[in-house]
Amino acid sequence: MAEVTLQNISKVYDDVDKKRGRKKAIEDISFTVHDKEFMVIVGPSGCGKSTLLRMIAGLEDISEGTLAIDGKIINDLSPRDRDIAMVFQNYALYPHMTVYDNMAFGLKLKKFSRSEIKERVMQTAKLLEIEDELYRKPKTLSGGQRQRVAIGRAIIRRPKVFLFDEPLSNLDAKLRSQMRIELQKLHREINATMIYVTHDQTEAMTLGNRIAVLNKGQLMQLDTPLQLYKHPDNRFVAGFIGSPTMNFIKGILKKNGGNFFLEVSTDYTIPVGSEIPAPFENKIGKELEIGIRPENIIISDQKDISTDESLLEVMAYENMGNEQLVYLSLKSQTLIARRSAQDSVEIGLKFFVRFPADKLIFINPENGEVFHKR
């Protein structure tokens, strides 16, 4: 298969608003997708992820930087000469053709023999479990079946690189979950280099060997799913990765004896430990923001006398079946905590709440950079 290398890639558009001038949709992005890797590019709508994928495919010009496959620069190659197959959100199947003919179409254009076309179609159909649908038209298929056909049409070409542009967005939740499993299986079986774009962080976390997180055209962080979740580099990644989102709490950093704490208000403080990241040790009296995942907030109806805990009121809760999401009021903020479904929760109840210091992240309010406990 192939290794894909992006070096200082940028995409610049001439903005229609003359006062704003040129607009950078992608700004100086560099990373390498390793041979046989499943790389996911994730970010909110408008972050530039689909633009970046289209640049890799050759559907958008590269304004600055170089794009290479296996060390060969392909900036000026047409899409058809890049040996790349792309699967879109809208399937793009020919409605008047059968599944067989849709899958075989590209091979027919390349003058493959009838026997080789049949062999490849049958192999691919078996892999995707659509043998029984080969002689049906797309309009008679379910959304999941149509997406399998679109993927099959890409696989049958045996390209160096597969590109997926939000291919599951049109499917319902149950089908999306099923297709995620099938894509994982497909990647293992064909052992191909895949680049997958989505706005859905669940897809990103379950599919990617590594994930590139984009925001406003910039690469915010590239790492494994677990590293992104546990060790985000910045506030954006900390808040974007994870559902429910991370809790963020602002306050003034104080010190009492050998212990640091965050003063959220004159009558509410949060202990943050006897040690904090070095950049904040001389920031006593300055604004600080901390973050903590919902599963790391400890709530109880009984106070632990060995720890510093404060009472917070339940504003709302969601019963998810296996757990509850409890929404707690902290001054003008709402915090989310996970709690066992077996524990009773009612709106208006007050719980003792503890924020374990070793589970906190520390955020520089000036640039959003995240620091972790030493």
Model feature map: region roles:
Residues I29-V40:
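Pre-Walker A (P-loop) beta-loop-beta motif of ABC nucleotide-binding domains
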Residues R82-F236, F240:
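ABC ATPase nucleotide-binding domains
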Residues A57:
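Helix-to-loop junction immediately C-terminal to a conserved catalytic motif
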